[in-house]
Amino acid sequence: MLSIDEAFRKFKSRLELNEREQKNASQRQNEVRDYLQTKFGIARSFLTGSYARYTKTKPLKDIDIFFVLKDSEKHYHGKAASVVLDDFHSALVEKYGSAAVRKQARSINVDFGVHIDAEDNTDYRVVSVDAVPAFDTGDQYEIPDTASGKWIKTDPEIHKDKATAAHQAYANEWKGLVRMVKYWNNNPKHGDLKPVKPSFLIEVMALECLYGGWGGSFDREIQSFFATLADRVHDEWPDPAGLGPAISNDMDAARKQRAQQLLFQASQDASIAIDHARRGRNIEALRAWRALFGPKFPLS
């Protein structure tokens, strides 16, 4: 029988990117880039966001791809943010169809129609990508933001560096804990609305909420993490790079209240699972953790 620690380590491993998934992500990046280059002047593209920071969870959805535009596309920079997104949307609809392409606040999402089975497996394939138009301004990037109607500054390298530093300061367990909570956040049991939006907000909060160093126990770390997230989800969480709008701006008061309730319930459910293990009920503890997280949490 799996010990609780063994189960968590197996769970962590299941949420990590493997070689086949990375290969498919690269193929999808090249596919979308090669097509968009027939429609726009693309200087280069690169995989970014949580995928590049190794904090992306499973199933592999909404992988960010920056498409850095050439100077020939500078006319977009002086227009409302929605203009370039509308044009990206129209171009991608031509290739993938309107049912597979949707506009988002700062990107265009392309769904590849990949089936997700009952165990959250996708045959190592990427479910969807987010195509993000961007301009390189020298020391940072600017991307369109429809909420403000403007181009906003961002620096994915700063985000990546902060995640790396946090991971190292937490005995190299920080990213695993973040992926676990993101996996919980993606659970279909929450309905159409994820508790925390964007999922990057979980990562931003973790920069402060996971503090004091790794305590050596996944179950207690996760319980404490959920509890602290619940306590602080109403706070304003600025961009860690100090450039763009607050990461927490996507959530209004009602959504934050719902998130707080669900995060608190998760911390309570974690406490129940811990109590099962403390009383020697290992099978019940594993089942409780699986009920909390979803099918990627192992029972054996």
From Swiss-Prot:
Cofactor note: Crystallized with and without Mg-ATP.
EC nos: 2.7.7.-, 2.7.7.85
Function according to Swiss-Prot or TrEMBL: Cyclic nucleotide synthase (second messenger synthase) of a CBASS antivirus system. CBASS (cyclic oligonucleotide-based antiphage signaling system) provides immunity against bacteriophage. The CD-NTase protein synthesizes cyclic nucleotides in response to infection; these serve as specific second messenger signals. The signals activate a diverse range of effectors, leading to bacterial cell death and thus abortive phage infection. A type III-C(AAA) CBASS system. Cyclic nucleotide synthase that upon activation catalyzes the synthesis of 3',3',3'-cyclic AMP-AMP-AMP (3',3',3'-c-tri-AMP or cAAA) as the major product, and 3',3'-c-di-AMP as a minor product at pH 8.5. At pH 7.5 also makes 3',3',3'-cyclic AMP-AMP-GMP (cAAG). Binds strongly to ATP and much less well to GTP.
Activity regulation summary: Activated for cAAA synthesis by Cap7 (also called HORMA2) and by Cap7:Cap8 (HORMA2:HORMA3). Does not require dsDNA for activity. The CdnD:Cap7:Cap8 complex (also called CdnD:HORMA2:HORMA3) is deactivated by Cap6 (also called Trip13).
Domain of life: Bacteria
Subunit: Interacts individually with Cap7 and Cap8; forms CdnD:Cap7:Cap8 complexes with stoichiometries of 1:1:1 and 2:1:1.
Catalytic activity: 3 ATP = 3',3',3'-c-tri-AMP + 3 diphosphate; GTP + 2 ATP = 3',3',3'-cAAG + 3 diphosphate; 2 ATP = 3',3'-c-di-AMP + 2 diphosphate
Alphabetical UniProt keywords: Antiviral defense, ATP-binding, Magnesium, Metal-binding, Nucleotide metabolism, Nucleotide-binding, Nucleotidyltransferase, Transferase
Protein source organism: Pseudomonas aeruginosa
Domain remark from Swiss-Prot or TrEMBL: The 2 domains are closer in the ATP-bound enzyme.
Listed InterPro entries: CD-NTase, NT_2-5OAS_ClassI-CCAase, NT_sf
Name this polypeptide is given: Cyclic AMP-AMP-AMP synthase
Residue ranges the record marks as coiled coil: none
An individual GO BP term: nucleotide metabolic process
Binding positions (Mg(2+)): 62, 64, 130
Single GO MF descriptor: diadenylate cyclase activity
Cofactor dependency: Mn(2+)
Annotated residues for binding of ATP: 50, 53, 56, 154-159, 182, 199, 245
Family the entry assigns: Belongs to the CD-NTase family. D05 subfamily.
